[in-house]
């Protein structure tokens, strides 16, 4: 996560977001993740940019809960020359989770199909923030949020009942896909969509 921006408006599917850092060398058509949801820049100025978002995407992500004036987590697409400081994040929302306990020990409830991809000390993305799983639970997970992360992202303001965008580690999905050929038919449980498909209004 690079910058904590702010939603200025949402009108007829057009988001306008105030920001500065993520606009460095930006160009029309480039991608910026908004709370973990990858969107395309369609217009920008010195301290703002705009993206179009469909009603389906809004309804299937935590963007449905964001209102003008709210803070939002922003991050540009990584380049080959950038340091990879966390795990690989694609900006493809796998599911929406619900906050059960706030920071510092953030607990999130997730759809049952997602729990198989969560492991202790594994990686998960919450509203675009790359985090390490502390406990993998039957119905979700917990992550430890340090004061710095709470202060420079939206996670510090999350309260029980709030919705968050979730993206699991893509490597887990690829491993599951590769191993499927070696699993006896009927044993594997349904999982989330395979990488590169569209599910729940978001590219996975």
Name each model feature, range by range.
Residues 1-204:
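Conserved loop->alpha-helix
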């Amino acid at each position: 996560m690079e910058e904590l921006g702010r939603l200025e408006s949402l009108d007829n599917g057009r988001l306008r977001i105030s920001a500065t850092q993520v606009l460095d060398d930006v160009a029309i058509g480039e991608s910026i993740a908004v709370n973990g949801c990858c969107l395309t820049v369609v217009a920008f100025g010195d301290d703002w940019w705009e993206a179009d978002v469909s009603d389906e995407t809004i309804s299937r992500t935590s963007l449905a809960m964001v209102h003008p004036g709210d803070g939002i987590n922003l991050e540009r697409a990584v380049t080959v020359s950038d340091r990879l400081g966390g795990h690989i994040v694609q900006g493809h929302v796998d599911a929406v989770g619900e906050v059960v306990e706030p920071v510092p020990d953030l607990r999130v409830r997730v759809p049952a199909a997602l729990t198989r991809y969560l492991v202790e000390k594994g990686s998960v993305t919450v509203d675009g923030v790359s985090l390490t799983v502390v406990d993998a639970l039957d119905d979700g997970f917990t992550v430890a949020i340090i004061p710095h992360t709470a202060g420079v992202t939206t996670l510090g303001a999350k309260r029980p009942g709030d919705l968050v965008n979730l993206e699991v580690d893509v490597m887990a999905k690829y491993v599951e896909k590769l191993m499927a050929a070696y699993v006896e038919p009927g044993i594997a449980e349904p999982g989330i969509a395979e990488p590169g498909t569209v599910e729940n209004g978001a590219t996975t």
